[in-house]
Amino acid sequence: DASEAANTQFRNAVWGLYEAPAREKLWSGGFVNPAENSMTLVDYGQVKVTNGQQGSRSNSTKLYTIPGEPCRAPANGVVVLARNLALTGNTVVIDHGAGMRSYLYGLQALAVSEGQTVEKGQAVGALGEELTMDFKLGSKSVNPWLLFQTSGGLFWRENT
């Protein structure tokens, strides 16, 4: 289990981002999987079982990845957090606008800094053995597979 200090550091660095004011929408089209070559270890919505007891559903997705390969920005945005946290390791949070943010945990190395603008597919760091990714609209987790397939309510047809 994580230490109280690690949990406090995570809460102070990340939780405020859940309710941060929304900037204008910076992305268009579908998002890309940050780990091009990966295998799902824990899927979004999967029920957690500990010691035979059913627990909560996973809000994030954990992927088995190839260490050293690039971790890609899922969509255009601004890096609002890029640092090592005791609880989640090297962590990158990208604000894509309209309240949509991607949270990437467990990177081997960081390649971006806070305040930096990134484009979809740009390397934001190097992958470790596992990547935990969480996509949130405000404080509500979003199924990443729908983002990658451009389906669902986030992909409305804009008036032209």
What are these regions (language model features)?
Residues 98-121, 149:
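Short histidine-centered loop motifs in beta-beta connectors
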